[in-house]
């Protein structure tokens, strides 16, 4: 069972130094995909091996998972993958590198903590304030992918993103993956579980305009 961590805890006010792209990756010029709430990082490990022409950055709020993922990267000598520990809201709000923003082409929020109780909705990763941060940081054309098996959470995320003027929904049927990055080449552990149990998956794609 996934351990929930309160992202509003004072423990996450301090963030680790954000390295430069050159420090994180073997080739800093590659396009960058960001996965927020990456857990142990298995999804990104698979993506990094399937598509070596991109760099992958995972942000996770559970420190032990990040430490283990970083160790695995070192042991496997993968050069296009890096992990950061902390609250994604704080980390992205602190990003000062224009190069990181220039290279960042897509972001995924896959099966985030649902925080079912209404009084805990403010702990959900996608909040109006966070989407405002992204609208100011991201370049036009940057993609956002969301995916969950919780309909209420999907509606909440979709409403929050769609109500920001700078993001437009893309019809999945009309989206040409051959012309863009496809994070659906591999599946997260949660997605595999959902598929095996024949549960519903709700997903949507947005583009910064």
Swiss-Prot record:
GO terms for molecular function: tRNA (guanine(46)-N7)-methyltransferase activity. Its EC number is 2.1.1.33. The active site is at 113. It holds the Pfam family Methyltransf_4. It catalyses: guanosine(46) in tRNA + S-adenosyl-L-methionine = N(7)-methylguanosine(46) in tRNA + S-adenosyl-L-homocysteine. Keywords: Methyltransferase, S-adenosyl-L-methionine, Transferase, tRNA processing. GO terms for cellular component: tRNA methyltransferase complex. Pathway: tRNA modification; N(7)-methylguanine-tRNA biosynthesis. S-adenosyl-L-methionine binds at residues 35, 60, 87, 113. It comes from the Bacteria. Substrate binds at residues 117, 149. InterPro entries: SAM-dependent_MTases_sf, tRNA_(Gua-N-7)_MeTrfase_Trmb, tRNA_methyltr_TrmB_bact. Catalyzes the formation of N(7)-methylguanine at position 46 (m7G46) in tRNA. NCBIfam families: tRNA (guanosine(46)-N7)-methyltransferase TrmB (TIGR00091). Belongs to the class I-like SAM-binding methyltransferase superfamily. TrmB family. This is tRNA (guanine-N(7)-)-methyltransferase. It comes from Prochlorococcus marinus (strain AS9601). The gene is trmB.
């Amino acid at each position: 069972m996934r351990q929930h961590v309160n992202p509003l805890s004072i423990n996450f006010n301090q963030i680790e130094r954000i390295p430069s792209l050159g420090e994180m990756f073997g080739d800093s010029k590659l396009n960058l995909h960001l996965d927020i709430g990456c857990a142990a990082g298995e999804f990104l490990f698979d993506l990094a091996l399937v598509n070596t022409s991109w760099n992958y950055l995972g942000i996770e709020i559970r420190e032990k998972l990040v430490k283990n993922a970083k160790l695995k990267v070192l042991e496997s000598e993968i050069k296009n993958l890096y992990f950061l520990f902390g609250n994604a809201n704080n980390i992205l709000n602190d990003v000062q590198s224009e190069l990181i923003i220039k290279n960042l082409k897509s972001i995924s929020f896959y099966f985030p903590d649902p925080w079912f109780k209404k009084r805990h909705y403010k702990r959900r990763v996608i909040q109006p304030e966070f989407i405002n941060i992204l609208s100011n940081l991201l370049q036009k054309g940057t993609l956002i992918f969301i995916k969950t098996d919780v309909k209420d959470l999907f509606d909440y995320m979709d409403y929050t993103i769609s109500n920001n003027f700078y993001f437009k929904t893309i019809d999945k049927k009309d989206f040409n993956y051959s012309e863009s990055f496809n994070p659906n080449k591999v599946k997260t552990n949660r997605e595999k579980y959902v598929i095996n149990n024949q549960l519903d998956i709700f997903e949507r794609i947005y583009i910064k305009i």
